[in-house]
């Protein structure tokens, strides 16, 4: 969706941004209006296929051995991207780290949605080549309880009371 790195070392696919109009429309229909029909499901899968191909191009272009998924496999704010990445990782077996900040089951808007089957398939995926990392012990217990997945704990905190040291 977007990057803050050198454009020569970056692969950006506009369809990957969760604020992209079509994705915002999908989210509105599923999570606000609570509606899903065959046309919407087909569109989700069509975008998923395009994104999966983009992920593959990215991996091949940069000859990656690992992929790091930063909070993309925990919250379904971009269903097609999460599905694409989960499916790609499952099919290729590429090693990956899924870094989770928070999960869909922590947000009321995602509970009981008409896309529950899609959410459970990819958020988080249970593929064995994925190393799950969470930022707190509550999330570590919840991912184990809800998804049967072990997760490593790497706290994502900063001390805002003290000034940072020199770089």
Where are these regions (language model features)?
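Catalytic cores of nucleotide-sugar-dependent glycosyltransferases that transfer UDP/GDP/TDP-activated
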Residues: 1-167
